[in-house]
Design a protein with these regions (language model features):
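Extracellular/virion structural assembly segments
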Residues: 1-48, 52-57, 61-74, 80-266
Length: 266
């Protein structure tokens, strides 16, 4: 198995140009590492977000996280070497969300819903993977003209390259509970109802020297300070499997490189 790790969002330091902005929901909120801070448009008309990296950057992934784009919406990205988007153009258009699966579509017990997947439980994020290209100018066009909110909003946007991390079977995925339960003087149980958070724990297989160097650089540059995107099954034909093993979060613990007989693992 091989996952992908994205950590260096080169769009965080550029000036973003957007079609519209509602009140204090500024475009700079998409560059904040707290996805609860959002950019919001004034209407549900097609919205364009564009910028200039300042120099050619290698891009292989675009992330829109914590958005309200509906299943009817689309996201189109464009990269180019000139501001007019006419030279060395790369484009890709995807559906904003995976299709909703009805009864009988998934295997029995899928996600605890007895074979039923409905829009309400889906996390609102869109990940666009592609073969990395080097370009200077970028834009994304969000088209969702029937959005029930009558506006479009995005909490986090990332443009960057990805590092392939092959990993062993036995990878963990679960929820960490932060709620503390105490007993009152009268004997009743009381909880402080804190929100749980999702986590994954991965051990790599044997890595190439280049992969080790990339992973260690991510640990140094991002550490616990920045956000990273992890996808355990990128571009998998089972889109529901890919969504379950994709998360935007922080590296809470990571090990050093261990040199083995065949190579290195982390």
């Amino acid at each position: 198995m091989s996952g992908r790790l994205v950590h260096n969002s080169v769009s965080d330091d550029v000036t973003l140009t957007v079609t519209s902005t509602a009140g204090s929901y500024a475009a700079t909120n998409m560059q904040n590492k707290q996805p609860s801070m959002k950019w919001r448009s004034t209407t549900d008309a097609a919205q364009t977000i564009s910028g200039d990296f300042g120099a050619a950057e290698v891009i292989g992934c675009v992330v829109l996280y914590n958005h309200n784009i509906s299943a009817a919406g689309t996201v189109a990205i464009t990269l180019a070497s000139n501001s007019g988007f006419s030279t060395d153009v790369y484009t890709k258009t995807v559906d904003a969300l995976d299709a909703t699966a009805g009864y009988g579509t998934q295997k029995y017990g899928h996600d605890g819903y007895g074979g039923y997947s409905e829009l309400g439980w889906q996390q609102r994020f869109t990940i666009i993977w592609f073969t990395p290209v080097s370009r200077r100018y970028f834009k994304v066009v969000i088209t969702d003209t029937t959005n029930s909110d009558e506006y479009v909003e995005v909490g986090r946007m990332m443009w960057g390259d990805f590092t392939n991390i092959p990993y062993r079977y036995g990878a963990e995925l679960g929820w960490r509970e932060q709620t503390e339960v105490t007993r009152t003087r009268g004997g009743a149980l009381r909880s402080d109802a804190r929100n749980p958070y999702r986590y994954t724990n991965v051990e790599s297989t044997i890595l190439t020297d280049a992969q080790v160097a990339d992973a260690l650089e991510i640990f140094r540059a991002a550490g616990r300070r920045s956000d990273v995107l992890w996808s355990g099954f990128p571009e998998n034909t089972d889109e529901y499997l890919e969504r379950r093993y994709t998360m935007l979060g922080k590296l809470m613990d990571y090990s050093s490189s261990i040199r083995e007989a065949e190579g290195s693992s982390i």
